[in-house]
Amino acid sequence: MRSINLETALENKRVLLRLDLNVLLNNGKITDTTRIDKILPTLKFLIKQKAKIIIISHIGRPKGEIVNKLSLKPVSEDLTNKLNENVKLITKDINQINNLDLFKNIEDKIIMLENIRFYAEEEKNDHAFAKHLASLADIYVNEAFSCSHRAHASIHKISSFLPSYSGLQFNLEINALKKITSEIKKPVSCIIGGSKISTKINVIKNLIPKFD
């Protein structure tokens, strides 16, 4: 994918921006904004380019059901404060949304769709669901590096329907990965962190020969 910062003709284009805003919540309050802070440069770039931004993301594992405590509302509020731009959360059923529902008001610049994992079609990588999402925008930007191994509709299938780009933070992650896979100077050790160790077994096996 090309980097979005190489695309200059973005004014009034609808940009479907896939983010990983899977933040920790405690009684509806965000306890760690790191994931939000890291994607701010991409959002600010798109705002500067006068694009119309449609944010897609998830929180938790609602398994295709609406779970109110996993709403993206706290995230939309935090982004509104940090960007000094209203991030309008749309809670309407995504399958019922069409182009006419978005950017009705001239002041609407950033729209956030409700938790994409409220829809079972997302994790099934559903063709029709991805095609519908794509119909809402002109281009797609993947700024969810940590989710990009998943064959989900808003990450994998959607790129079949729209011109696709990588976000600024996505590119930084790729460059960091290149450094530990192709630019290693030995002796070197590797420290791996994170949860869900079962999803990292293959990565660890891949890295073992490269480190001491």
Task: Map each language-model feature to its residues.
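Active-site loop-to-helix "anion-binding N-cap" substructures in soluble metabolic enzymes
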Residues: 1-212
